[in-house]
Amino acid sequence: MALRVKFVFTCLTSCVFLAFIHLTPGLAQSKWSTPAQVEGPYYPRTKPKEVDSNLLDFLGRGWPDGEPLQLKGRVFDQKGVLIEGARVEIWQNDNNGIYNHHKAPNREKFDRRFQGFGSFITKKDGRYNFITLVPVPDHKRPPHIHVKIFRGQKEILTTQLYIKDHPENNRDGLLSLMLYPGQHKLLIELKDAVIKPGLRGKLGIYDFVLSKNF
């Protein structure tokens, strides 16, 4: 009887602890850091003439082809503390699967209305916010968005984000090598959303957890 009471008490204690972790902002994220992935060949060493967080409004050239995506979230350290002043960079292909990079195949066909690269400095609440395009498959790889995070001039994280449940994911070499706990956190769920008045598209929310404390 005593053993049964002890077992029930232990189970209840565990459930309460798990609920506490789930409901406490930032605490759950500190369990795993965001997995790193390779930079890839198309990081823009020469940046576009205009660099901001809205990749669809570039030099007044008009709207690029493709489905709009709002990608937003927060940046935490390992303790679950929100990080202010981190520079989040993203780069990706256009709606034709082409990068704006001198080594990219078919670069001459890149949609010049698309910025292709963006940057955002996190606020006091650790938040970042981009308006970009839903990525498309390219070079036999599933849709993905490349990400770098800096603190000052120091690069803290390089990784890639993928679309959850996309059929191309199972064919990708990098995703098939996800052997370590937490690698699934590179998958983001996209939902229909009103990004801003008059602009409908997809919404993806992703919180980065850096492997260091600051």
Segments from the language model and where they lie:
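Bacterial N-terminal signal peptides
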Residues: 10-22
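Intrinsic disorder/low-complexity segments
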Residues: 3-6, 20, 202
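Hydrophobic alpha-helical segments with strong N-terminal bias
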Residues: 6-9, 24, 28
